[in-house]
């Protein structure tokens, strides 16, 4: 009889790298970073496709005769817009003669504004004011501010009002022989006698608590009045000083101008200029008092429900060549906390005409077709990696990656994986031992693995008191790290909110502080990943060793009396009794099926956090898929000895 010894033998050479961790070690043919750095895509996107709304004009209007060539967005995104060609929120607020008057209204947690160009210097709107840019800036800023605190908003295009009997609607030559719809101009006929100057105007208007289906907790109202350079300009007929003042129901002044107590400009000019201040007023009844001759009456508002904080994105709205634009939208967004601004880098060049269908703008707005994990002033990200090469500029919302250097991201073994025989001798009760951040806090420790030669693996029975990290303890370690990170981030967020309150007057200080905190969090997260990497390697090592034990047990069971296990992973077999086909059945499973191995280990960790700063939030989806199927047998050779 000829007896031979068949053993499982390691296949490790110089191409393998050794990964030492507490609890178990691995040889691997490759390694990869736990995460790759992501690069934000320029432009706008949204966190949730079901909770956003847009306000636009002809560049987003599906009813435009040149659509889709006239559009800067896809047909899918255009469905989200409340748009009408020629319209803008400010045009609907003031209603200058001959301009589009569209009822803007809608609801959404995230509001995108791509409008404003239709009221610009090219529109040449006069009505007692040659340049409306500063009023437009304040109007857009107020819209963005209130929209960020509301779920729904709507134009209220008809306020209830009471007008004095002696006043009648007036017109102006410099307003196309008409006047604005808001404010409306009312005049009194005054005889050219000093003693007959007319009566003081007393009017009333009511801001509703609801407009249609839209709840109104706060209204944006334009308080407009004339500015005279001198008393003589207004007082040509000897009728005193000019005043136009708005009072609330308690008699408190909330807006307007009173030249009875305030000085005139002192400039030289014969024509007054109209000024409009943006007031945020609660629903209720208000009174307007004005000097004889003229009354400017608020007749419209924008109403906001103020129900929840939300996100606001403003898109630069400018003309193509040959038309003069302003940059009020840009300036308004940049001066509104939390507003994200989308800006072009090149002149507007349209496809349908010079002013509609710009390719760069289409690219910047293409992200509105998708859901992003993070949106920021630097762009949007939909990858799951928690790291980016450059710091993302605020404002930012969602699960935003932190800035990190590529070389600082831990690497994990990949490719062909083979466990070693090394164990962490400092761990005596693996089933009750939990690895976590406390291991680093209590004190640093270093585990030296001393092996003969290049190393390998050990097959055999595992004792309860043996070293190594069990799958159960690794999973508990993951859970503990997750909880530690949650506590750390929650405390950090609370601290940030308090600091924001204390230094809210210094926006740059907030930005600097936030950057420092983000850098610290990035370093902390990289440290956490180092721990997670160690747990992963230990978990995989134990899993592979379990697979080898299962393989050895399966071989012993298949052999029955034909082979005798003389040591872990080695069997003696009688070559005359068990021929090649018999051996193939036992050791190669008839060469018809792969060697049974454990399924891929679940190494997915999902760490969530509370909102970050300025409404933002940070989260991680740490996913390290490691496929172990068929890897164990590919790293093992059948060694025969006689």
UniProtKB/Swiss-Prot annotation:
The keyword Membrane applies. It catalyses: N-acetyl-9-O-acetylneuraminate + H2O = N-acetylneuraminate + acetate + H(+); N-acetyl-4-O-acetylneuraminate + H2O = N-acetylneuraminate + acetate + H(+). The chain crosses the membrane at residues 618-638. It is found in: Virion membrane; Host cell membrane. Its EC number is 3.1.1.53. Residues 1-83 are annotated as: Esterase domain-1. The active site is at residues 353, 356. Keywords: Disulfide bond, Fusion of virus membrane with host endosomal membrane, Fusion of virus membrane with host membrane, Glycoprotein, Hemagglutinin, Host cell membrane, Host membrane, Host-virus interaction, Hydrolase, Membrane, Transmembrane, Transmembrane helix, Viral attachment to host cell, Viral envelope protein, Viral penetration into host cytoplasm, Virion, Virus endocytosis by host, Virus entry into host cell. Residues 639-642 are cytoplasmic. GO terms for biological process: endocytosis involved in viral entry into host cell; fusion of virus membrane with host endosome membrane; fusion of virus membrane with host plasma membrane; virion attachment to host cell. It holds the Pfam family Hema_esterase. Residues 352-637 are annotated as: Fusion domain-2. Residues 1-617 are extracellular. Residues 1 are annotated as: Fusion domain-1. One of its GO terms (molecular function) is sialate 9-O-acetylesterase activity. In natural infection, inactive HEF is matured into HEF1 and HEF2 outside the cell by one or more trypsin-like, arginine-specific endoprotease. One of its GO terms (cellular component) is viral envelope. Disulfide bonds join 197-239, 216-303, 224-276. Residues 83-297 are annotated as: N-acetyl-9-O-acetylneuraminic acid binding. Glycans are attached at residues 13, 48, 131, 176, 382, 539, 590. SUPFAM superfamilies: Influenza hemagglutinin (stalk), SGNH hydrolase, Viral protein domain. Binds to the N-acetyl-9-O-acetylneuraminic acid residues on the cell surface, bringing about the attachment of the virus particle to the cell. Plays a major role in the determination of host range restriction and virulence. Class I viral fusion protein. Responsible for penetration of the virus into the cell cytoplasm by mediating the fusion of the membrane of the endocytosed virus particle with the endosomal membrane. Low pH in endosomes induce an irreversible conformational change in HEF2, releasing the fusion hydrophobic peptide. Several trimers are required to form a competent fusion pore. Belongs to the influenza viruses hemagglutinin family. This is Hemagglutinin-esterase-fusion glycoprotein. It comes from Influenza C virus (strain C/Pig/Beijing/10/1981).
